[in-house]
A protein has these predicted regions:
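A generic structural motif
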Residues: 1-2, 79
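Short glycine/proline-enriched turn or capping motifs at secondary-structure junctions
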Residues: 2-3, 138
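Sec-dependent N-terminal signal peptides
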Residues: 3-13
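Bimodal "functional hotspot" detector
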Residues: 16-150
């Protein structure tokens, strides 16, 4: 009987743990390259990527996502001032001369919608050389308020 109590106590103590892990705690592995929104200029629809938690949306990840999606149009994050993200497109030839009006508009929409999904950013300033279909500008998220969100 004494051995049974000792074994029972040992089992109880062995099963007690002081882990700080919460039951049902979900861990997210977030890529360094994301786009929070999938945009479609033709239908004026933006679809939120539900696999990305709000806490995972950072300017660095969004910029990396844009550069991965549009390798011909490299965008740099320069700084944040107030609610504006300042960016640069060092070589805007492809954007301004080869993508056409619709392509450039789609790129700007994708960039603005995704960059302004970062908390605290409402405007994006683009610095680039002037081209036929693209030039330096500042665009706010409000430009896309009439788009349907899904």
């Amino acid at each position: 009987m004494r051995y049974a109590i000792i074994i029972l106590m040992a089992l109880v103590l062995a099963n007690c743990s002081n882990d700080d892990k919460k039951i049902n705690e979900t861990e997210y592995l977030i890529s360094d390259s994301i786009l929070a929104w999938d945009t479609n200029l033709d239908s004026m629809i933006m679809r939120r990527d539900s696999t990305i938690p709000d806490s995972g949306i950072t300017i660095k990840r969004i910029i990396n996502g844009l550069n991965e999606k549009y390798p011909e149009v490299y965008i740099d994050f320069l700084k944040q001032g107030g609610d504006t993200a300042y960016t640069g497109v060092p070589d805007a030839d492809y954007l301004g001369e080869q993508m056409g009006d619709a392509g450039a508009m789609a790129w700007f929409a994708d960039a603005v919608i995704n960059i302004t999904s970062v908390p605290g950013i409402n405007y994006v300033s683009f610095k680039m050389d002037t081209h036929s279909h693209a030039s330096s500008t500042v665009i706010g998220r409000g430009e896309y308020n009439d788009w349907k969100k899904e």
